[in-house]
Amino acid sequence: MVHVEMSPEAIATQKPYLDLGLTEAEYDRFAELIGHQPNDTEIGLASGMWSEHCAYKYSKPVLRQFWTKNERVLMGPGEGAGVIDIGEGKAVVFKAESHNHPSAVEPYEGAATGVGGIIRDIFSIGAKPVAMLDSLAFGDIEQPHTQHLVDRIVAGIGGYGNAIGIPTVGGETNFDGSYTRNPLVNAMCVGIMDKDQIQKGKAAGVGNALIYVGAKTGRDGINGASFASGDFSDEEAADRSAVQVGDPFMEKLLMDACLEITGHHQEALVGIQDMGAAGLVSSSVEMAGKANSGMVLDLDLIPQRETEMTPFEIMLSESQERMLLCVRAGFEQEVLAVFADYDLDAAIVGHVIAGHQYQLYHHGKLVCDVPVSSLTDDAPIYHQQGKMPKRLAQPAADFDPIITDPVQIWTDMMAMPTIADKSSLYKRYDAQVQTNTVVLPGSDAAVTRIRGTHRALAMTTDSKGRYLYLDPQVGAAMSVAEAARNLVASGAEPLGITDCLNFGDPTKPEAFYELAEAAKGIIAATKAFNAPVISGNVSLYNETNGEAIYPTPMIGMVGLIEDLSTITTAAFKQADDLIYLVGETHGDFNGSELQKLQTGEVTGKLFDFDLEAEKQHQHFVLKAIREHLITAAHDLSDGGLLVALAEMGFDAQLGAQINVTLPTAWGFSETQGRFLLTVAPENQAAFEALHGPAQLIGRVQAAPEFEVTTVNQHFSASLQQLQTAFEEALPCHMNQKA
C-alpha cells in the first residue's frame, strides 16, 4: 500500500490521523507544541512516537512505580536492554519484547521478526547474544486456527534463531481460550559482555555523523507501532502490510559488524540503537532526546529498496535488520570500512546539530521541523482510573474437586495442553549452537555456561494468565515467584527480570485496573527476591471485537549459578533417593489445571499466597543445592504435586513410592512456594540438619510405577501410561506423530 501525501490543511479538516491512532485532542496538542499545522510527515511521526508502543502514554504512570535498581544493576529501563553485573568483569544483558499483533495476522514473519528485533536490542548494548527464550500463549488447541498459529509461529522462531546461530534454550507454551484471536508471542534474548563496554543509544556532539546500516528501507511494517497500539476486529485481521519481513542472514552480518564496532572501534562510537518500533524516527529522535541534541537527516541518503517512497513511509517503515549509529566526526570512513567488509549497506544520513530541532530533508525540501521533545518527552501521559471487574468484586464459589478415579485424572492431567510435553515444538529449535547450553529445554530453567569461568546463567520465562484473571495483583506476584522457583530449582540465585505486560485496552477502566494491580504484585515480588525490573515492554490492546485476553504479564528472569557443579535438574537420578516435599499444601484449586479439566472454566477467588514463606523456601532450597545435598529439584506449578512427580521420573524411567497426609485431590492442588527434592540416602542426616520446611514423603524406585498413598486412597500409576499421555497429547492435536 502506497501512502498518499496530504496538505496540512487537508489533514486538519479530513483528520486522517484518527486512523493512525491519534485523537483530535492529541492533534491539537502536537500542533501547539510544534507551533504550526503539522504536515503529512510530521503527523506521521507523531502517530508513531505518541503510540502506546513508543510513548507508554497509558502505562508510564504504572511503569514508573517499578523497582528497577539494586547494587548489581548497571543499566535499567530506558535503553535497548538492561544490564546486570555478574562479577569477574562480566555483565549479563537481557530483555523481552512482544510481537503479538503481527503474529496474529502473519504468524511466521510476525514471530521471526520478533526474534530479530530482540536480538538487535542485545547487541546494540555491545553484548554478544548467547541465548533465546520465548513465551507463547495460544487458544484452544483443538481448533484448526490455533493449530495453524502454533505451527507457523514456532516455525518463525526456529527459522530465524537457527539461521542466525543463537540457541533457543527454553520457554513456555500455554493454551487458553482467551488467546484464540490474540496469541501472545514474547521473545527474550540474553547476552554476555565486558561490563566496561556498555553502549547507549544517544546522539551527542555537534557535527557528529549519523550512519545508517543494514537492510534497505521498504514499505513493510509502516506504522507498525500504531498497529501494535490498537485492538482488532475480524475485518482488520487481514492488515498484513503492517507486518515486517525478516532476513536472519542479514542480521547475522549486522550483528557481527556491530559487535566489531562496539568491541574494537569504541573511540569512533558515540551511540548505537536498533530501528525497531516506529523505525527510523524512533531510533533517531530517541538518540537525540537522550543527549538533549538537535538532529538533521537527509532522507535521499537513506538506502531504499522501493521507488518513490514518501518521507512518511521512509521514516515509519519498520523494515528489519537496520541500525543507526552516531559516529564521531573524522571516524566516519573507519566505521564505513568495517561495514563494507561485511558487505552491508551503510551511509552517512545526517548529523547532530546545535539546538533542539529535529529536521528532515527530502528532495532538497525541508519536510519536518519540530522540537525533538515534541516527539519524546512531551508525548501525552494519561492518568487513568481503574475499576475492579465484576468477576473480582463478586467471585464465584470455590471449586471443590471430586476424584473417584485418581489414575485416570492423573493421566488426563498429563495430557492437558499447558502441562503436556512441548518437545514436538521446541525440537524445531537449535538449542545447542554455540555449544554453551548445559541444561536443555524441558527442565525448570535453561542453563548456559559463561565461557572462561566456572559459572553459568540460568534463565526462564513464566506467565500465569489464569491466576491474574482471578486476582491481578496476587497472580502477578505468583508469576514472579514461579520464575524465581524455576531458577532456584536449577541452582541459581535470581538476578533480575524483564517483562512483557500483555493486557487489554487501557482506556477501559477494568483493563487498566488489571494492569495497575498486576504492577503492584510485580513490585512486591521483585523486592522480595532482590530481582529488579531492568527492561521490558508493554503490549496493550490485546483484544478482538471487545474480548480481551487474560491479563498476562510475562516474567523473564535470569539467575547466576556460582559453580557449575551445583547445576541441578528436575529428573530423578537413581533409585532409593529420598523424596522431600518443601512447603505446605492446601486445597488451592481456583484457576488450576484441575478446575480447567473438570469444568472447562476458570472461576472463583484466587487462593492465598504467602510471599514471605515463598522467599524462605527458596533460600532453603538454594542453600541445600549449594551444599551438594540435592540430586534433583523441581518446582511445583501447573497440576501440582502428582504432575511434578511424574515429570521427574520420565527421563531416567524411574518410579516412586510416596505417602502423603493429604486428600487425593490435593495431589493436584497448585499451592505456591513448593518444591520436590531428592536426596541421596547418605546425605539424609546433613539435609535434615538444615531444619528446612521439608517433609520426607517417599523414595525413588527402579520399578517404572508411581505408588501413592493419601489419607483416603492408595493407587498406582504406570510411568508408561502417564508418559504416553504426556508426550502424545500435543502431536495428536497437531495431527503429527510423536
Swiss-Prot record:
A GO CC annotation given for this chain: cytoplasm
EC number: 6.3.5.3
GO molecular function: ATP binding; magnesium ion binding; phosphoribosylformylglycinamidine synthase activity
Disulfide feature: none
Subunit structure: Monomer. Part of the FGAM synthase complex composed of 1 PurL, 1 PurQ and 2 PurS subunits.
Family stated for the protein in its record: Belongs to the FGAMS family.
Name of the featured protein: Phosphoribosylformylglycinamidine synthase subunit PurL
Species name: Lacticaseibacillus paracasei (strain ATCC 334 / BCRC 17002 / CCUG 31169 / CIP 107868 / KCTC 3260 / NRRL B-441)
